[in-house]
Amino acid sequence: QTEMARQHDAGMISYRIDASSFPGAYGEMIEETNVLVANHIAVKMQVIALAQRYAIGDLSQDMPLLPGEKRVITDALDAAKANLGAINAEIKRLEGAAAAGDLSQRGNVAGFEHDFADMVAGLNQLMQTTDGNLAHVSRMLRAIADGDLRARMEGEFHGVFARIAGDANTTAAQLATI
């Protein structure tokens, strides 16, 4: 047992005691110990395999319902899957709203914790910034359509929104000279 413990501590989790080296009942006890160790390692490997699937976004598999005190493993993986599914659903909901032109939608930050809450808050900021900047463009175009060629996009814009603001203001200025 000492050698098995040493091997497992060193990362050699496949190591087993040679039960054939022990006669009779001792050999049977060793074999039963090997089976016990193998069963514990099998559960760990199931957890690892499932975590690897979840890590790449494959939520199609579940952890089998484990008995007794091992049930905490099933419960933990079920919770991980549920939380990953919830953040995925929230992202898809916001993406669908944005694709449909509804930038007023916001994610439920309070429904998540830690980095998931940060992700939803970041998506909310993206939706809000995009909605606000496009509202500026819309107001300016509406003003120009109503004949107000003095309309300008004013405010702090960045990136593509700064370029749009500059182009819109230049367009209004050019139209005013006609």
What is each stretch, according to the model?
Residues 2-177:
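Polar/charged heptad-repeat coiled-coil helices used as signal-transmission/dimerization stalks
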